[in-house]
Amino acid sequence: MCIRDRLYPSGSNWMEQAKQRRQIAAYQEAQAQMEQKKRAALLAEADRYNQKLAELGISFDMLGEAEKEALLIDGKSYDELLLAEDSGVMGYLEIEKIKLKLPIYHGVSEEALESGVGHLEGTSLPVGGETTHAILFGHRGLPSAKLFTDLDQLEVGDTFQITVLDRVLVYEVTQTEVVLPEELNGLTAESDKDQVTLVTCTPYGVNSHRLLIHGERVR
């Protein structure tokens, strides 16, 4: 999930940011035109998915076909939840400190990570709630986009915001740490807590470890 030894030209980054703004604008327009009843239903499905994750004790590192089937919501799979429009955007992330605003996509495929932030399947959907822990991945150093390149500037006490449909969630950074890739398996939901962890590769250009920015919801 890392790009090695690449820098982003300013022109390419500007074009990619314009694309990201268009994707977010399309998402905002789609959800604004949606009936309130439909928005509420989509969020309720996501809440039920998160409740199932917690109740069944399923984590991303043990996600097989049986677990995916157990997590179906009224026959809907993970990829079918929180779909406000056809692009696959489930919401967007804003980090004011580093002037970042990125769409959030289902999964951590290269396609998703080249365009924005990827949500790690098998972790809580980023809609908040007790005993939830959403994990969001982003690239650093893509040749065409800045993405999570400046994530290391975040410090304890800083905040970031996630918007999914008409639900706006604010998280405060509680801890930053650097771990080995295999140590991500310890990221699980904690009872009664509402958490999000942002993940990218580090050191920049080496990418042997993962930088984790842990946040807990404050409003």
Give the label of every model feature segment.
Residues 4-219:
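Solvent-exposed, non-transmembrane regions of membrane-associated and secreted proteins
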